[in-house]
């Protein structure tokens, strides 16, 4: 005998039990009960700090060499390795990025210069002292106008002139490497 439609199990759906994610505890009724606090204390967000700096690449009077600053690598156990970078520093209140760049180059290297053109802007994030730092650095190309090469003792370990063709290979920071490589035609 053939069952009539709807008379048997055909056409009826079985109710599925809803699965909960493995990392979730079963829900229980808490009516009349106070919820128990989490065992882990909430982790506070790191404070965000915005910093704006300016600097760049100074080209010597011959047009063949660029100026870099070297700082000791804090991760080097022997303390001998230098991290080479472009001279730069914070923009002070009332300064334009151009004014700050010229001042910072002179302070860190002893070299006076004038800006010939913009090189670009680097924007990045890092953690320091428990704070999230958002840093924007305005970079320029400079022409040397005078001064005597001398490292600023409080911030820089060494300064030096290097052939322009070697600058990208010497730079320690990938963002600066990319910026110079992208603008290589401006250095010729």
Feature map (PLM): residue ranges:
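N-terminal acidic, proline/glycine-rich, low-complexity intrinsically disordered segments
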Residues: 1-15
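Short, charged/polar surface micro-motifs in flexible loops or helix N-caps
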Residues: 62-65, 74-75, 92, 121, ...
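The catalytic Nudix box helix
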Residues: 86-119
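C-terminal alpha-helix
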Residues: 182-187
């Amino acid at each position: 005998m053939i069952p009539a439609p709807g008379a048997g199990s055909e056409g009826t759906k079985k109710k599925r039990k809803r699965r909960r994610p493995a990392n979730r505890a079963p829900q229980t009724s808490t009516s009349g009960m106070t919820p128990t606090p989490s065992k882990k204390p909430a982790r506070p967000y790191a404070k965000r700090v915005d910093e704006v700096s300016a600097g760049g690449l100074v080209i010597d009077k011959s047009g063949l060499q660029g100026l870099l600053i070297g700082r000791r690598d804090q991760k080097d156990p022997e303390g001998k390795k230098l991290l080479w970078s472009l001279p730069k520093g914070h923009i002070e209140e009332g300064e334009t990025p151009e004014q700050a760049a010229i001042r910072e180059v002179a302070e860190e290297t002893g070299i006076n210069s004038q800006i010939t053109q913009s090189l670009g802007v680097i924007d990045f994030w890092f953690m320091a002292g428990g704070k999230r730092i958002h840093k924007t650095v305005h970079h320029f190309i400079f022409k040397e106008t005078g001064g005597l090469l001398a490292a600023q003792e409080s911030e820089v370990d060494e300064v030096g002139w290097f052939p322009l063709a070697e600058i990208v290979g010497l730079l320690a920071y990938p963002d600066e490497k990319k910026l110079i490589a992208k603008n290589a035609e401006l250095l010729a």
